[in-house]
């Protein structure tokens, strides 16, 4: 086998490793394993992800480009901080983009879109309908299914840039939501709330679906302010 052929086969494998590391690092930042403001030391990251510095630097540079990580002059990388002002900025923009996307999806959505909304809701409901203790045990699974459901709702909006910006803001909002999740008491499930959004979308009631999404996002903002003020408004 020629060196060129070996290189061609190795390149996709290297890309898969880089993407896997990026996904894991992002998930660990969102989940709080690396809290806001934490230094990201290469030695510790190499031990955690079992990859070289080049792969880590590539992943960290990408996360810096989307605002999840910051570059400290002469000190490497650190997790981006959080603040009340940033929460307000992220949430207000996300609400705007989410509402625009759901309205366009409802207008443009076809049978395949309807089926994806129903399927992702069904999977989400499979956890949200369970007892509180089981929901807590399956929280990480719920996070992924919740993301899938909300993506399905807006997936037919017809604008890749709107979807891209919405996904970026959603990740930042998820970090705030998970901060509050770790500090607030386990409440009732949100099955009825998600069912109402699903029903409004499938019935093509755009204004109602958009308002329900706004209320859900505002609920998240209120919970962050109530249960995680020490992160967004640290004492001076």
Question: Which sequence ranges carry the predicted segments?
Answer:
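Short helix-capping/hinge motifs at transmembrane helix termini and TM-loop junctions
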Residues: 106-107, 158, 182
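C-terminal regulatory/effector modules of DNA-binding transcriptional regulators
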Residues: 2, 24, 48, 182-236
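Conserved amphipathic alpha-helical segments that form helical-bundle/coiled-coil interaction surfaces
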Residues: 111-178, 190-199, 208-219
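Flexible, glycine- and charge-enriched loops at secondary-structure boundaries
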Residues: 15-18, 110, 135, 139, ...
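Residue-level marker of regulatory loop/turn positions in helix-turn-helix DNA-binding domains and
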Residues: 14, 79, 94, 142, ...
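Short alpha-helical transmembrane interface motifs in multi-pass membrane proteins
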Residues: 83-84, 177-180
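Short linear motifs at protein or domain termini
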Residues: 1-107, 221, 225-236
């Amino acid at each position: 086998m020629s060196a060129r052929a070996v290189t061609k086969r190795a390149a996709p494998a290297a890309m898969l490793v880089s993407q896997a590391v990026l996904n894991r690092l992002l998930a660990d930042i969102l989940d709080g394993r690396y809290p806001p403001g934490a230094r990201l030391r290469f030695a510790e990251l190499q031990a955690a992800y079992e990859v070289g510095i080049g792969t880590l630097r590539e992943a960290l540079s990408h996360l810096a480009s989307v605002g999840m990580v910051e570059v400290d002059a002469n000190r490497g990388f650190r997790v981006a901080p959080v603040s009340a002002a940033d929460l307000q900025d992220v949430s207000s923009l996300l609400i705007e983009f989410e509402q625009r996307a759901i309205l366009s999806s409802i207008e443009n959505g076809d049978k395949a879109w309807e089926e994806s909304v129903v399927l992702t809701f069904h999977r989400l409901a499979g956890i949200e309908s369970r007892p509180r203790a089981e929901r807590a045990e399956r929280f990480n699974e719920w996070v992924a299914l919740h993301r899938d459901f909300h993506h399905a709702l807006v997936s037919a909006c017809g604008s890749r840039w709107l979807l891209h910006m919405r996904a970026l803001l959603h990740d930042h909002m998820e970090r705030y939501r998970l901060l509050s999740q770790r500090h607030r008491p386990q409440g009732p499930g949100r099955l009825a709330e998600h069912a109402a959004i699903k029903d409004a979308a499938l019935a093509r009631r755009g204004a109602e679906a958009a308002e329900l999404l706004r209320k859900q996002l505002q609920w998240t903002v209120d919970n962050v302010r109530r249960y995680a003020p020490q992160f967004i408004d640290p004492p001076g």
